[in-house]
Amino acid sequence: MALLEIQNLTKRFGGLTAVNQVNLEIQTGEILGLIGPNGAGKTTIFNMVTGIYPPTGGQIYFQGQRIAHPSLTWRKRLTTPVWWLSWLPIGTIREQWDEIRTLRPHEITERGIARTFQTIRLFNNLTVLENVMAGPHHRTRSGVWGALFRPPKQREEEVFIVAEAERYLTFMGLQEYRDELAKNLPYGHQRRLEIARALATEPSLLILDEPAAGLNEQESIELMALIRQIRASGVTVLLIEHDMKVVMSICERIVVLDYGKKIAEGSPAQIQNDPRVIEAYLGESEEDEEGGGAEEPGRTGVGEEV
């Protein structure tokens, strides 16, 4: 059984179809790359997998359980008995309701999916340690009253969270910066910090959206080593990346999107030599070649950054 399975996934924004009938599977322990020209629908897929957008059509399954479903119209909700009872704290009712709705982002995180973003999203005025402490919050149980009165259980959980945060800071090579404000870190370290916070949620699947963006060559090499270590620790990795050196070096399998559709899937060697992929990146066709091989604006070669 695939760890993550996407079936006929579609997303429309008004009259624009951003993702069109995409099928994709990722197996446990794999590093899978999702690539394509800008606007191909890559991040939209990530946003549907993590509950930010509900799909217009299709299904998403994680560990065999459906986590995303097209939004229910109000008419459909009113005629669905379980919707009327969904507020009740009864396990069987909640399970039935979960089968016909898209889970919220925090619920998907609790299921075992964590992500980073194209644009770094940190708590800039918190320390490096405090940023990572936000990761394992869903694994604790103390609430408002615990924070106010600080019973022994609250203090135990705080010790646990700090220890977990420091473990992931050490793993990502950031321990010496634990007391620095996040906004004062160099850009490359901010990228690492965002990954450390995601890892602190203890995910089975880590989704990285352009983790090498803005990094220099040495930082990219170090990032690749870290991603391999993450996979070796038992975490499956799904990534979007425009740096083809990174993609071709660490991904066992690559899926290519163009204009919202999957056009190719295979090993790095297969993808590099696939004429459909070359055409998508170069914008070439037989007519283009006759006219001098004109390049479509905004698209570059498979071996170059996009």
What are these regions (language model features)?
Residues G293-E305:
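Intrinsic disorder/low-complexity segments
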